């Protein structure tokens, strides 16, 4: 799974201001397909963090941490409270599954 290349392309596209889903080889599209635990386990902690935060970015979240601000642009963001970000059913489940895998892997 070449998630790094796909993430790079998705990050470039996210900067265009278009609210579009990110699709990942081996995972699917984050707003219309459920990611499987098995597929997510193939990713590194960094990749999991990036995929999870791409979901929040495409839904208008303004990142608060220095790490996230350096990795994602806050241009065009409009929601400061992560709990207020409106995610659809697929996105909510995918975030939860990613967080579960991150926890199992001991990601920080």
Language-model segments: which ranges?
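Bacterial N-terminal signal peptides that target proteins for export
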Residues: 1-7
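Hydrophobic helical h-region of N-terminal Sec-dependent signal peptides
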Residues: 8-12
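N-terminal signal peptide c-region/cleavage motif recognized by signal peptidases
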Residues: 15-18
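Acidic/histidine-rich, surface-exposed loop or edge segments in extracytoplasmic proteins
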Residues: 27-37, 77-82
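Amphipathic alpha-helical packing elements
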Residues: 39-73, 77-78
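Compact alpha-helical subdomains of small soluble proteins
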Residues: 63-108
């Amino acid at each position: 799974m070449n998630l790094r290349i796909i993430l790079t392309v998705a990050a470039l596209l996210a900067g265009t201001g278009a609210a579009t889903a990110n699709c990942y080889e081996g995972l699917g599209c984050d707003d219309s397909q459920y990611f499987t635990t098995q597929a997510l386990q193939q990713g590194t902690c960094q990749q999991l963090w990036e995929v999870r935060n791409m979901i929040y970015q495409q839904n208008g979240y303004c990142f608060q941490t220095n790490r996230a601000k350096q990795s994602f642009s806050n241009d065009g963001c409009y929601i400061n409270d992560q709990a207020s970000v409106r995610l659809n059913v697929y996105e909510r489940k995918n975030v939860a599954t990613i967080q579960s895998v991150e926890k199992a892997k001991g990601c920080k």
